[in-house]
Regions:
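Basic/polar phosphate-binding segments, predominantly the helix-turn-helix DNA-binding elements
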Residues: 1-2, 24-57, 80-102
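Charge-dense, low-complexity intrinsically disordered segments
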Residues: 4, 28, 165-169
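Short, well-ordered helical secondary-structure segments
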Residues: 12, 44, 49, 72, ...
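Residue-identity detector for glutamine
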Residues: 3, 11-14, 38, 98, ...
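A solvent-exposed interaction/effector surface
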Residues: 63, 70, 89, 93-171
Length: 171
């Protein structure tokens, strides 16, 4: 299987997840979107994204739920059911495990948390192919210290030689 075929298949799965984020998604649905078997779809998804499809889906749903809790005055139970969690207890456990703060406390006092914001896999590989690097990649940096020293302006004394046949006659 060619690399770009894998990338396009994972991109189709990402698009399907983004389109159906608020409805139940099965591995069978993702496999149909990718056009491969369930096993192969899950394998290439993990290979290219570093997460299984359901780890990816859960992290994405929790991050979108955190944004909704932060930006609106929605109840925790409503947000939990909107993002396809079976109960608010399960949602609270998952939210607390992911972000280290309960959703109720986060909605009352939103502190900065690390949200899962995945990039489109196709765009990522296109930029990698072009040779562009991410700002998060560390490059070898060299530090240069500069010290400004102010000195008085110099004056020039120029004395031209009257008779000289070579350079050393001037000395």
């Amino acid at each position: 299987m060619e690399r770009w075929e894998k990338i396009n298949a994972v991109q189709r799965m990402q698009d399907y997840i983004n389109k159906h984020i608020n409805s139940p998604i099965t591995l069978s649905d993702l496999a149909k979107a990718a056009g491969y078997s369930q096993y192969h779809s899950a394998r290439i998804f993990r290979e290219l994204t570093g997460k299984s499809p359901f780890e990816y889906l859960r992290a994405l749903r929790l991050s979108k739920a955190a944004l909704r809790l932060r930006d609106s005055r929605a109840k925790v139970i409503d947000v939990a059911f909107d993002f396809v969690f079976d109960s608010h207890e399960g949602f609270t456990r998952a939210f607390t495990k992911q972000f280290g703060i309960p959703p109720k406390k986060y909605s009352e006092d939103p502190k900065p948390i690390k949200l899962f914001m995945p990039s489109r896999i196709r765009d990522y590989y296109l930029t990698m192919q072009k040779g562009e690097t991410d700002m998060s990649e560390k490059k070898d940096t060299k530090t240069v210290f500069v010290q400004v020293v102010e000195r008085p302006a110099r004056k020039l004394i120029l004395k031209r030689g009257i008779k000289a046949d070579n350079y050393f006659d001037y000395c």
